[in-house]
From Swiss-Prot:
Species per Swiss-Prot/TrEMBL record: Mycolicibacterium vanbaalenii (strain DSM 7251 / JCM 13017 / BCRC 16820 / KCTC 9966 / NRRL B-24157 / PYR-1)
Database matches in HAMAP family: Ac_ald_DH_ac (MF_01657)
UniProt key word Transcription regulation: no
Alphabetized NCBIfam families for the sequence: ac_ald_DH_ac (TIGR03215), PRK08300.1 (NF006157)
Protein name (database record): Probable inactive acetaldehyde dehydrogenase 1
């Protein structure tokens, strides 16, 4: 059944991420509608496409949004600009802002893991594409055993890494690493990001290593990961395990040597995840962008429904 709730949203940034997000919302029968797409370059690209589709646009950047007649109806703003836009006017208006860039303003949010804890938070950071793909796996392992260390390696196609992605790569790695701890629950973490120039372009691939204290029940970890993958797949259909979860046990007589921390005894869990982007705007190899736009749309839909129910209960 089509939801009766309709929440107009504004998208800041008319590049690949902003345009794909717009197309996803336009083709959805969910609670979101596109009230505005804001960028800096009227054509070619997202703004020209939005105008053809009847979406209100502005080429004046963030400063142009409050001046638009549609601004008063906007309930949620997606910030898909490379470094994050100033938001004093947005805060005054009381809109919810979802950041699709590594500039951390609000708490980290990964919908499959912790969105329900932040439905009333005015500003959420959606981490990175790598974080959206890997943090759920670390969190799933952490629900069975204590993750003392998590390391993730994400490889993306060079064609899916635009200039903004390349310019912000250090900040993206820092944000992903932080989210592995704050959302994933790992005590220590490291994130590695690789831009692969192969042609034809590769699909997004993520390898997640978790060092878990003690000899944990492997079946429970596999079940927890499978359940988490199912949750992520509900909003990113192209997200899947590449192969079965791998386990390796290290004992006191044969520990795993880790630089700076010494020997580790316990279980190493290795998970391989692959992401294929889908319709309508992104090519299949742009899984890193797919993770961001799909997570953003899922988060906004849940927040919109929550706000509607909260407002209804208050009247």
């Amino acid at each position: 059944m089509t939801p009766t709730v309709k929440c107009p949203v504004a998208i800041l940034g008319s590049g690949d991420v902003g345009t794909d997000l717009m197309m996803k919302i336009l083709r959805s029968d969910g609670p979101l509608t596109v009230g505005a797409l804001v960028g800096l370059d009227p054509e070619p690209g997202g703004l020209a496409r939005a105008e053809r589709l009847g979406v209100p646009t502005s080429a004046a950047g963030i400063d142009g949004l409050p001046a638009m007649p549609e601004f008063g109806d906007i309930g949620i703003v997606f910030d898909a600009t490379p470094a994050g836009a100033p938001r004093a006017e947005l805060e005054k208006a009381g809109v919810c802002v979802l950041d699709l860039n590594p500039a951390v303003v609000g708490p980290h949010c990964v919908p499959a893991v912790n969105l329900e804890d932040h439905l009333d938070t005015p500003n959420l950071n959606l981490v990175t594409g790598a974080g959206q793909a890997t943090v759920p796996i670390v969190a799933a392992v952490g629900r069975v055993g204590a993750v003392s260390y998590a390391e993730t390696v994400t490889s993306v196609a060079a064609k899916s890494a635009d200039p903004a992605t390349r310019a912000n790569i250090d900040e993206s790695i820092e944000t992903t690493t932080a989210a592995l701890r704050t959302v994933g629950g790992a005590r220590r973490a490291r994130s590695i990001f690789i831009i692969n120039p192969a042609d034809p372009p590769i699909l997004m691939r993520n390898t997640v290593y978790c060092l878990v204290d003690g000899d944990v029940p492997r079946g429970d970890i596999e079940q927890s990961i499978a359940a988490m993958v199912e949750r992520v797949t509900s909003y990113v259909p192209g997200y899947r395990l590449k192969q079965r979860v791998q386990f390796e046990t290290f004992t006191a007589t044969d520990p795993l040597h880790i630089p700076e921390t010494g020997g580790f005894t316990g279980t190493r869990v290795t998970v391989l995840v692959e992401v294929t982007a889908g319709e309508p705007h992104l090519p299949g190899y742009a899984g890193n962008l797919e993770m961001m736009t799909s997570a953003a749309k899922a988060a906004a839909e849940r927040i919109a429904l929550h706000r509607s129910r909260t407002a209804g209960a208050a009247t």
